[in-house]
């Protein structure tokens, strides 16, 4: 049975605030929201089915994983973490890849993420709109297409930049024809 629970911004912020009080070390851990989590944090969706974070820095990722294990979370698969008895699911992506899509630049570079909130030990941002659209269109399911349309309707998108970055990102994809077709379908759908 699919997970019917949905996470709101308030619930996510409460969880991250609790984590912030327990994480050891002085340096911040950068959590860059992607997927439906980003759209929820931006206020375009009321909730998300699970929490998707990109953790670009490998040392920060290692610190986060150590914390999660100490806090009782279990790794369900390569990316997914869950604490027994809780419903909240976290998908954590290390480095510059969201699912199987490798970004052309680190989301920690200027302009590659938007700050949502900064705690003492956690920086919470969302992936920039163009990279968010690219990662969603590479998956290409109906929900992802709808999410991209939502971004186009609410964010200033430079379509020349989107097309160029999308095509360059597609060069590194094993199913290049499929993802390029996803872009064509999407652009026809929004008529840009």
Where are the model-predicted features located?
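Compositionally biased terminal segments of proteins
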Residues: 1-192
């Amino acid at each position: 049975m699919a997970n019917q629970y949905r996470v709101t911004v308030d619930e996510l912020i409460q969880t991250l605030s609790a984590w912030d009080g327990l994480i050891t070390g002085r340096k911040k851990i950068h959590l860059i929201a992607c997927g439906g989590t980003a759209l929820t944090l931006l206020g375009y969706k009321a909730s998300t089915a699970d929490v998707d974070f990109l953790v670009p820095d490998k040392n920060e990722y290692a610190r986060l994983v150590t914390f999660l294990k100490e806090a009782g979370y279990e790794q369900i698969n390569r990316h997914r973490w869950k604490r027994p008895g809780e419903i909240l699911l976290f998908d954590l992506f290390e480095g510059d890849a969201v699912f199987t899509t490798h970004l052309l630049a680190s989301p920690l570079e200027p302009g590659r993420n938007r700050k949502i909130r900064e705690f003492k030990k956690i920086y919470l941002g969302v992936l920039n709109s163009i990279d968010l659209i690219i990662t969603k269109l590479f998956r290409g399911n109906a929900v992802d297409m709808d999410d991209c349309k939502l971004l186009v309707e609410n964010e200033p998108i430079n379509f020349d930049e989107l097309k160029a970055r999308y095509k360059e990102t597609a060069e590194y994809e094993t199913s290049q024809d499929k993802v390029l077709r996803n872009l064509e379908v999407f652009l026809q759908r929004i008529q840009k």
